[in-house]
A protein has these predicted regions:
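N-terminal secretory/targeting leader peptides
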Residues: 23-118, 128-354
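Short, low-complexity disordered leader/linker segments with a strong preference
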Residues: 1-28, 348-354
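Core domains of carbohydrate- and sulfate-ester-processing enzymes
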Residues: 123-127
Length: 354
């Protein structure tokens, strides 16, 4: 199925036109999330998918959603969907790097594409095809599940003035960025979202990155770690809908189309909701929390991060041809797309602030 062409060849109106009939199959699915039940806007994406498919199918295709407090395994989503315990999951692809390093780039890469660039790569630059090739090996499909946009660089107890300040720092930071921070001397840990504040409060970690002001402020990180750094590591963090391949392939075609369209709509809605949340929270943050010090890492730190990124990419590309193929595809697309990003967004913003 050509997932990247669903909206172009079918369209939501067409899906509505082929709604459920009395003879249609009744299907009840379950979806497991990495997130707790109140972690908006992440949890809103699966909820919207369930709502859309239920309405389009006249209640014959339903999806029950179980949050991490129900499954008791926030990072077990991959395996639960793979074995068919759940037909779907909502998580992030870079959490599965220990299972298959080729899954990692489909979330985001340090110093990589912006959100528009990455979505264009997925749907028109070959990204979806590459992603399905990787996940097919595991009996799964993966679909974009909502983007956070560029993330902030994290909350730190102390100011980072030089690369030496990273040595021995205990930090929660997932994905390829975690590999980079480990290489430059940090002790990197991956902690479930529901345990982040407690881990920071108890001193289990010295720093963490989460998302951006829209989600971070209500978590209370600023009460403990007031140094808030701008980002470099996750310029376009894409969550994912994981779908059991056998379950999806066994759906009636119209249900496949309903689900595929619902996921794409919900992913975009999550992106713009998160953007709104962060825009509103940024203004509130500067007014209500003057103790927060917004900083950018010094050039000396960026230099070592970029050097580590380059070395690690070469290392992983040498180990895994599939990983290399994905990275080369992303970099080639970004090289071309970035010319337009600079000409449009960058120069517009530069002109508007001068």
């Amino acid at each position: 199925m050509k997932f990247n062409k669903v909206l172009g060849t079918l369209g939501l109106a067409a899906v509505l036109a082929v709604g459920a009939t009395a003879a249609d199959k009744v299907v009840h699915w379950r979806l497991a999330m990495t997130w707790g039940p109140t972690l908006t806007p992440f949890v809103n994406a699966p909820a919207e998918v369930a709502k859309i498919v239920k309405e389009l199918s006249d209640g014959k295709f339903t999806i029950r959603i179980d949050a991490s407090n129900k499954t008791k395994s926030p990072f077990g989503v991959f395996d639960m969907v793979k074995i068919g315990q759940y037909q779907m999951g909502h998580s992030a692809s870079y959490y599965w790097k220990g299972k298959d390093i080729a899954t990692l780039p489909f979330t985001t890469m340090p110093f990589g594409m912006t959100t528009p660039e990455q979505y264009a790569w997925f749907y028109y630059g070959g990204g979806m095809k590459l992603m399905q090739e990787v996940y097919a090996k595991h009996g799964l499909y993966s679909f974009p599940g909502g983007n956070t946009g560029a993330q902030m660089g994290g909350w730190f107890r102390k100011e980072i003035k030089s690369p030496a300040d990273l040595k021995g720092l205990k930090m929660r930071i997932p994905g390829f960025a975690g590999e980079i921070m480990s290489k430059v001397g940090c002790t990197v840990v991956n902690i479930a979202p529901g345990e982040l504040y407690t881990s920071l409060e108890r001193g289990t970690i010295d720093a963490l990155e989460w998302v951006g002001p829209g989600m971070d402020i209500r978590m209370g990180f600023h009460k403990i770690a007031p140094y808030y750094y701008t980002g470099w590591h996750e310029p376009a963090t894409e969550l994912q809908f994981l779908v059991n391949k056998k379950a999806f392939d066994g759906l009636p075609k119209k249900y496949q189309e309903m689900l595929t369209v619902a996921m794409r709509v919900a992913a975009y809605d999550m992106y713009i909701e998160n953007y709104h949340m962060s825009a509103m929270a940024w203004t509130k943050m500067k007014k209500d929390y003057p103790n927060i010090k917004v900083l950018t890492f010094p050039k000396s730190v960026f230099d070592v991060l970029k050097k580590a990124n380059k070395e690690l990419l070469a290392q992983y590309e040498a180990k895994d041809p599939e990983f290399k193929k994905i990275i080369e595809s992303q970099q080639a697309y970004m090289k071309q797309a970035r010319q337009w990003t600079k000409m449009s967004d960058y120069l517009y913003l530069k002109a508007s602030f001068e």
